[in-house]
Amino acid sequence: MKAAIFYGKEDVRIENVEVPEIKSNEVLIKVAYCGICGSDVTAFKTGNYVSGLIIGHEFSGIVEKVGTNVRKFKKGDKVTANGYIPCGQCKYCLSGKPSLCDNLEMTGITINGALAEYVKLPEHVVYKLPDELSLLHATLVDPLSNVLHAVNLSDFKPGNSVLIQGAGPIGLITLEVLKRSGAGKI
C-alpha cells in the first residue's frame, strides 16, 4: 500500500509498505479520507514526530477486516477513530482522565497513522459513523470533538461574548459551534 511516512524536518515521503497485520483486538480500516492537522504541519516544519512512522489521525474509512475478539464492528462499517489511544490501566485512565494516560499512544505521532491506504487500530478507539454523514465530512470529527470538549469545559453560556484567536480549521469550527450555541458577540 502507499503511505506518507515522516522522516524528519520537511521530510515526508510517499512509499510502498505492507498492509498492516491486525491483532485479535484490532480493526483494519481502508482509509477513505485523511486530513492534515495543524500538528502535522508543525511536525513537518520542526521535525518533532517519531521518524519512520506513517502520519495522519483525522480520517474516515470503511472496515476491511476485524480481529477475532472484535465485537462492535464488521466489514463494510463506516468508521472514524479517536487519535488518542489510552492504555485503560494506569491511574489516570482508571480515574476517568484517559488524555493524561501514562502510556498514551497517538495515531500518526507515536504509532502508524492514517495517511495511507489502510490503518489498524484497537477496537476501543474506533467509532461507527451514521449513514447520513459522508466519509469526506467525517474527517472533521476529530477537530469537532476537540472544539466541543473545549466549549464544554469552559464557562460559556448562551448570550456570552467570546473571542476566538485563529481562523484555521479549529477556529472556524469553534465559530460555528458557538454561533449555534447562542453566543452573543463573537
Question: PLM features: what roles do these ranges have?
Answer:
Residues 2, 26-28, 161:
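Residues that mark the start of a beta-strand
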Residues 7, 18-19, 51-57, 107-111:
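Short Gly/Pro-enriched turn/cap motifs at secondary-structure boundaries
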Residues 20-34, 47-91, 130-132:
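Glycine-rich beta-strand-centered segment in the early N-terminal region that forms part
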Residues 37, 72-73, 82-127, 131:
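Cysteine-cluster motifs in flexible loop/terminal segments that predominantly coordinate metals
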Residues 39-45:
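Cytochrome P450 core scaffold surrounding the K-helix E-X-X-R motif
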Residues 133-186:
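Mid-domain Rossmann-like dinucleotide-binding core that forms the NAD(H)/NADP(H) cofactor-binding site
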